[in-house]
């Protein structure tokens, strides 16, 4: 059984929705067990509520130690000035012990994101996540152009060869489209298939 973790942080629900699509794609691959977990919130609850952040997310909170139990880890975070959120960075910064043991060497890693605008730093945010995974010796999987939704200019949409993505708009009113969710599913399935091949 190939074990896949979809690990995410979501402020307003966009990445939470994308995480579910990624998990759906991974589950479509026979012999795959998928867990969806989030990283801890760092914003005080009162501040988060006043900002309208989505706090009722059912996914359990992950621990750093459990990362070593998975064959693949797909990390999702919205952008903050062109990089991952402090919540996700704080979590990944605690993985030094795993790095020292080589606990994630050879496992599959991937990333997905959301931005407020079409040019809001999707690729740099993905790179900020992927850099961490590469330092752990993980085999990185993106979202290749074999996913047809990456091509075409008929609509404003997320999606890059470095990972699935969505555009939220400045007020968060835009929700992930079917093309963007399709990219998330495609990437999730590709990660699961790749991890299964590496496990032999």
UniProtKB/Swiss-Prot annotation:
Transmembrane listed as a keyword: no
Chain sites annotated for binding FMN: 10-15, 79-81, 114-120, 135
PROSITE patterns named among the record's database cross-references: FLAVODOXIN_LIKE
Record field: catalytic activity: a quinone + NADH + H(+) = a quinol + NAD(+); a quinone + NADPH + H(+) = a quinol + NADP(+)
Name of the top EC class for this enzyme: oxidoreductase
Alphabetized InterPro entries for the sequence: Flavodoxin/NO_synth, Flavoprotein-like_sf, Flavoprotein_WrbA-like, FMN_Rdtase-like_dom, NQO
Signal peptide: none
CC annotations in GO: membrane
One Pfam family here: FMN_red
Keywords recorded for this protein, A-Z: Flavoprotein, FMN, NAD, NADP, Nucleotide-binding, Oxidoreductase
Residue sites binding substrate per the record: 99
Sites where the protein binds NAD(+): 12
GO molecular function terms listed in the Swiss-Prot or TrEMBL record: flavin adenine dinucleotide binding; FMN binding; NAD binding; NADH:ubiquinone reductase (non-electrogenic) activity; NADP binding; NADPH dehydrogenase (quinone) activity
Gene3D superfamilies cross-referenced by the UniProt entry: 3.40.50.360
Domain (Flavodoxin-like) ranges: 4-191
Cofactor(s) recorded in Swiss-Prot or TrEMBL: FMN
EC numbers, comma separated: 1.6.5.2
Cofactor remark from the record: Binds 1 FMN per monomer.
Family: Belongs to the WrbA family.
HAMAP family: NQOR
Record's protein name: NAD(P)H dehydrogenase (quinone)
The species this protein was found in: Rhodospirillum centenum (strain ATCC 51521 / SW)
């Amino acid at each position: 059984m190939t074990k896949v973790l979809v690990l995410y942080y979501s402020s307003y629900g966009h990445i939470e929705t994308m995480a579910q699509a990624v998990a759906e794609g991974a589950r479509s691959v026979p012999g795959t067990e998928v867990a969806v977990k989030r990283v801890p919130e760092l914003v005080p609850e009162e501040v988060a509520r006043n900002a309208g952040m989505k706090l009722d997310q059912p996914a359990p909170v992950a621990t750093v130690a459990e990362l070593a139990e998975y064959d693949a880890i797909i990390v999702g975070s919205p952008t903050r000035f062109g990089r991952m959120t402090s919540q996700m960075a704080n979590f990944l910064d605690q993985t030094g012990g795993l790095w020292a043991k080589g606990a994630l060497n050879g496992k599959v890693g991937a990333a997905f994101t959301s931005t407020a605008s079409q040019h809001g730093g999707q690729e740099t945010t993905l790179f900020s996540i992927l850099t961490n995974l590469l330092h752990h010796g993980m085999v990185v999987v993106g979202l290749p152009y074999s996913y047809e939704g990456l091509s075409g200019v008929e609509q404003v949409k997320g999606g890059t060869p470095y990972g699935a993505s969505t555009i939220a708009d400045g007020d968060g009113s835009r929700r992930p489209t079917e093309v963007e969710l399709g990219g998330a599913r495609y990437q999730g399935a590709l990660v699961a298939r790749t991890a299964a091949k590496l496990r032999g």
